[in-house]
Structure formats: C-alpha cells, structure tokens
Amino acid sequence: MFGDRQRPMVLVLGLGESGLAIARWCARHGCRLRIADTREAPPNLAALQAEGIDAEFVGGPFTPSLLDGGVEIVGLSPGLSPLEPALAALIAAANERAIAVWGELEFFAQALRALGTSGYQPKVLAITGTNGKTTTTNLTGLLCQRSGKKVAVAGNISPAMLDRLARAIDETALPDVWVLELSSFQLETARTFAPDAAAILNITQDHLDWHGSFDAYAAAKGRVFGATTTRVLNRDDAAVMKFAPAAGAADAARTVTFGLNEPAQQGDYGLSRDNGIAWLVEAVDRDAPDETTSRRRKRDGVHTPDIAQKRLMPADALRIRGLHNAANALAAFALARAIDLPAAPLLHALREYRGEAHRVEVIATIDDVDYVDDSKGTNVGATVAALDGLAQKIVLIAGGDGKGQDFAPLVAPVARWCRAVMLIGRDAPAIRDTLAETGVPLADHATLEAAVHAAAELAEPGDAVLLSPACASLDMFRNYAHRADVFRAAVDEIAIDKGATT
C-alpha cells in the first residue's frame, strides 16, 4: 500500500477532507501517525478523535522538526501551497532526508498498485481543467454506469478517493471503473498516477497565488497523464494542446481531441452544423469496414484515412445548456470510448444528464427572460465559457474577489453578448476599468440583491440574466453556494412581483 515501505510512519500536513482521508487510510493499515495543522483546533480534529484514530496531533506553524522521530512519508493536503515559506522549508528538509512527499492521489495510486497484485485491475478515468470538471466527471460516471459498469466517482468532487476506496473494500464492492475529478492542487504531488484515459478540458488563469505562475499551474494539470494514458485534449485551447504528442510519436495514436468545430483527424470529436442544426460528431475512416480496423489503422499510422463526419446526436438533445457543455459532453464520451465502452448506451446517457447546481443552471424563466445561476463561475475562464456558451443577449452580474486575475479575456464576449453588466464586490473597480472599452453599460451595486433587481429591469424578452461572477465569493458570502442562494432568493422576489412562479 505504501510502495516498498511496510507500515511507515506518516506525517499528515493539514486536516481537511483529504488530510483526514489520508489519516484514516494510514491508520487502517497500521501506520504510526503524526498530524500537523497550522490551526490549533481544525474542524476535522473532533472527527479524528471520535473515530479513535491513534495519532499525535501538533497544532501551530509547520517546522522541519515535524519530520523527526522516523517519518518516512509526508502526506500533503491539497489546500496547502508548497510555495508558502514554512511549508517550502519543511518539504525541502524532507527531500534532503529522502522522505517521500505524497498527496492523496499518490496514496490512491499506490493502493491500486498493491491491490493489483491480488488481481484487481479497474479502469481509471481522470478529468482536470480550470472549468467544467465536476460536470464532466459526473457525466462520465453516468455514461459508464449506463454501460453496465460498477462505477465510483471521487476526488475533488468528494468523497475523498481513499475514503471511497476503503468503503468499496469494506463492502466487497470494488468498482469496475474509477472516475476521478482532479484539481491542480491534487495533481501537484502526483508521482506514479497513470490512468487509462484522462482529459484536460481547458487551462485558463486560476490559482496563480497557489502555484506561483501560469506555467506551473499548467504543468500541474499535465501530471494527469501517465506514460500509457490515452490523452483527451481540447483542441480549441492552445495551453491544453501543448500536451499533445508530436505527430508520429509513439503515443500519438493514444491522443484524442474534442472541440467545437468539425474534427479533421480520425477518432476525434467535435460539432458539425447542417441546416441550422449542430450535431455531435466523430471523425471516422470512410474506408474502414469496422471500428476495430479503423483503430488498428490509426495505431499503425500506415494508412491515410478518408475522413467522414459520423453524426452521434443533435447538440440540442443535450439537457445541459451552452456550447461549453457540448464540449464537456464530447470529452465525457471520448473518455468512455477510450476504455472501449459501446457507443449506444453512452449516447442514451448523454440525453439523460441534467447538469449540476450552480453551473450555468437555468433556475427560472420570467416574462421570457432566463435567470441563470453560474455562481460556480469563480474565474474569468468560466465566465467567458458561460457567455459564449449561452450565445444570447445577456445582462451579466459579475464581481467579487478576483484572486489577482487578468480580466481582459472578458472584453470580447462582453462586447458581443452583454446588454449590460452589473458589478458587485471587492474587485468591481478592476472589472469596470477593464470593460470600459466595450461600451457596454456598467453599473455598480452594493449588494447582489440590488444587482439582480436592476438586471431584471434591463433584460428584454429572449435575454438571460446571468450570475457568473468570474470571482471568488468570500468577500461577500460564505461560499459560492451561499451566493447562489442569495441570487435565487432575489429571483423568487422578482417572480412574486411579476405574478410568476419559479
């Protein structure tokens, strides 16, 4: 379970969800445990004690002395930035002493490897990206389930991977397929993780305060791929396509792309438009008599295919709104097909999926105006995707804690789609300065409630009022879900005023 180590002493840093899962897993396997957190009484400490886990707890600043006493593995919680000076010093000391530094994902990878010696060989699918991870992860899980597989969905999406694995072992119900949502934080400490197929949905500015630079952030995303992983890449995103192997490389045949245009390479996915209808399509070899032959020819690379667009389903048959969600659906389909699941049940499942709360979720239509909750849109890339995905006139509500982002990517979609922008929160002035060149009316509001009511007055039939803040919520709210609740309450008030229902 721990590489070549037997019941090692483990230092767990941070007692969040992943840290608690690491502690549980290590205690389960008889490891000596030391747990450290910068907080004297972290919320999960009570859970740790209630479960009777035998561990030394140290509260306060991290120091290299935490490694003393025989520590063999450091288990690092994903919320802790390795750039933080005290943690950086501790990690440097661990490296000097040849002490392994693992995150939960590496513990999970090592556990699967150990279980493999007993014959357990599940398929593992992984999804990362700045935006769309949760939607694509849940959708991929549903596709695999509808194909008759036992599926476990875990990771950044919750539950923690190790908790889900422990439950599967206890219930003698190990899944056929693992579908993992992985953040850049989780991938930062990946060492031997090698899923069967993995997708990078997009890479835009986010968490730069944690990683230090965009290049470091992108590099962390790239750790989702192992040496034999099928790569599912968004060809519309230049940062993602940097992870595509060179043409003719040994692993080029294990690369699949998706995008919002017609695919040109065999086995890729995209959209094709005909008579005003957008279709999800796959590029196929017109001359191949069957799929097996087509895949063999792609792998061997000795045949130049005559490409045809195979229609899979109309994009309008998806229940999730927006072109960005069509891209997410293509990524999920590509992942499931990469492990040879049959297409027919996957396509039925695509029509079934209803989407996730707070992710471009239409919560009401009042007087022919859609009210759309995208409170999970906590970065610029998410808001750009929502604007371009809805592709209609929009009154946008944006603002909050910008986390040092560059708001410039908002200029083009705001100029194209927005009737007006309502600004809230700490970084409203920075967004206003950036969007001034668009000529779109901008209005500042002290509260989200005021912004929603003002947006409703400006919206015209056929428009959408979109809450997609491009910012974190903590300057005004407990979290993005609290922000969404306030938005929904304001929309309910508007419905009552207009004599409508939501």
From Swiss-Prot:
Q: Which UniProt keywords apply?
A: ATP-binding, Cell cycle, Cell division, Cell shape, Cell wall biogenesis/degradation, Cytoplasm, Ligase, Nucleotide-binding, Peptidoglycan synthesis
Q: Where does ATP bind?
A: G129, T130, N131, G132, K133, T134, T135
Record-linked Pfam families: Mur_ligase_C, Mur_ligase_M, MurD-like_N
Please tell me whether the keyword Transport is annotated for this protein: no
Pathways per UniProt? Cell wall biogenesis; peptidoglycan biosynthesis
EC class (word): ligase
Q: Which residues cross the membrane?
A: none
Identify a single GO molecular function assigned to this protein: ATP binding
InterPro entries, per database record: Mur-like_cat_sf, Mur_ligase_C, Mur_ligase_C_dom_sf, Mur_ligase_cen, MurD
Q: Which domain of life is it from?
A: Bacteria
* Major localization class: cytoplasm
According to its UniProt record, the EC number is 6.3.2.9
- State where the protein is found: Cytoplasm
Name the catalysed reactions: UDP-N-acetyl-alpha-D-muramoyl-L-alanine + D-glutamate + ATP = UDP-N-acetyl-alpha-D-muramoyl-L-alanyl-D-glutamate + ADP + phosphate + H(+)
- Function recorded in the entry: Cell wall formation. Catalyzes the addition of glutamate to the nucleotide precursor UDP-N-acetylmuramoyl-L-alanine (UMA).
NCBIfam families reported for this sequence:
murD (TIGR01087)
Which family does the record claim for this protein?
Belongs to the MurCDEF family.
Q: Which PANTHER family match?
A: UDP-N-ACETYLMURAMOYLALANINE--D-GLUTAMATE LIGASE (PTHR43692:SF1)
What protein name is recorded for this chain? UDP-N-acetylmuramoylalanine--D-glutamate ligase
Species of the source: Burkholderia ambifaria (strain MC40-6)
The organism that produces this protein has a lineage beginning with:
Bacteria, Pseudomonadati, Pseudomonadota, Betaproteobacteria, Burkholderiales
Q: Which gene encodes it?
A: murD
